[in-house]
Amino acid sequence: MFEPVELSNNAVIKVVGVGGGGGNAVEHMVRERIEGVEFFAINTDAQALRKVEVGQTIQIGNNITKGLGAGANPEIGRTSAEEDKELLKSALDGSDMVFIAAGMGGGTGTGAAPVVAEIAKELGILTVAVVTKPFNFEGKKRMMVADQGVLELSKHVDSLITIPNDKLLKVLSRGISLLDAFGAANNVLKGAVQGIAELITRPGLMNVDFADVRTVMVEMGYAMMGTGISSGENRAEEAAEIAISSPLLEDIDLSGARGVLVNITAGFDLKLDEFETVGNTIRSFASDNATVVIGTSLDPDMNDTLRVTVVATGIGMEKYSDVNQTKNKSSKEILMDYRYQYLNISPTAIDKKNVKNEIKETDNKKRKEPEYLDIPAFLRKRSD
């Protein structure tokens, strides 16, 4: 049996959109009225910030960019965030949990998001990042810049969810409009934030507090997220199976997850046996050593509908450990790596192996890059 725990809804949760894509995703969440969280948009582009309808906006790097954006250069994004580090620290201070949303491959999102994450971690905040990777047609240069951004970000977050934009093409109809496609993408990010936040902020039959969430997500590395919705007689089993078998999650082995966080959202008609069904379905793929936390959120508007949100953390921990060994590098070494990756990748088609060899010859060092896991949450409308 799964035992209920006491509710604690005093946790301060902030959602920070970094760059154009992150700002658009956060604006979508504001419109959807996710409860119990504060929203921020951070950008180098003053015009973009004026257009976004978010609770609080923070312009960074004005002395560097003059409010004109990072120009798809992550170095400008990084230095802009460093310039206004105290301003960012003030915005994040007092948080218990911070979600960072960004698009990798552009300027502000790629360069500034790791700085924001580093500040949050220095403040002792539980830090979760949800980022996108570019479509293949955007070119190898942008993809490699995105990979480097993910690598930098992974050093400063507790859990990292990456979303490959190309997987979006497999779950949407070919005739869908561009606007609807990006709306669907933002819904995935919303689902990740909402599913976790509502466990803490919204009352349910089986409540979960912030300490439970922290246990599952702190220092866990790569993570995945899936959502399933169903109605009718077998809604519990169907929703749980959809959540763990989304096409967005293909080729991902969930059995190695060290932590699993589950939120069941339903109306007042939620039955105990449905709670058990979801729990048993989730445990069928989780390892015996995984920490599994299952809670519920009651939504009176969900008549006959049940939603299951699953966040599996600690996936591919060996790869994540290899990545975090780079923490021992000096900041100068990391900066030189980052600049080389961005400035020396030709915009034409280049074999990634050749680029890695060039980097190796420059440093006289071998570098290991993790095989990034394709895991869900939101899709970028803009990456810088």
From Swiss-Prot:
Its main location: cytoplasm. The keyword Coiled coil does not apply. Keywords: Cell cycle, Cell division, Cytoplasm, GTP-binding, Nucleotide-binding, Septation. It comes from the Bacteria. It holds the Pfam family FtsZ_C. InterPro entries: Cell_div_FtsZ (IPR000158), Cell_div_FtsZ_CS (IPR020805), FtsZ/CetZ (IPR045061), FtsZ_C (IPR024757), Tub_FtsZ_C (IPR008280), Tubulin/FtsZ-like_C (IPR037103), Tubulin/FtsZ_2-layer-sand-dom (IPR018316), Tubulin/FtsZ_GTPase_sf (IPR036525). PROSITE patterns: FTSZ_1, FTSZ_2. GTP binds at residues 20-24, 107-109, 138, 142, 186. GO terms for molecular function: GTP binding; GTPase activity. The keyword Cytoplasm applies. PANTHER family: CELL DIVISION PROTEIN FTSZ-RELATED, MITOCHONDRIAL DIVISION PROTEIN FSZA. Belongs to the FtsZ family. Homodimer. Polymerizes to form a dynamic ring structure in a strictly GTP-dependent manner. Interacts directly with several other division proteins. Essential cell division protein that forms a contractile ring structure (Z ring) at the future cell division site. The regulation of the ring assembly controls the timing and the location of cell division. One of the functions of the FtsZ ring is to recruit other cell division proteins to the septum to produce a new cell wall between the dividing cells. Binds GTP and shows GTPase activity. This is Cell division protein FtsZ. It comes from Buchnera aphidicola subsp. Schizaphis graminum (strain Sg). The lineage of its organism: Bacteria, Pseudomonadati, Pseudomonadota, Gammaproteobacteria, Enterobacterales.
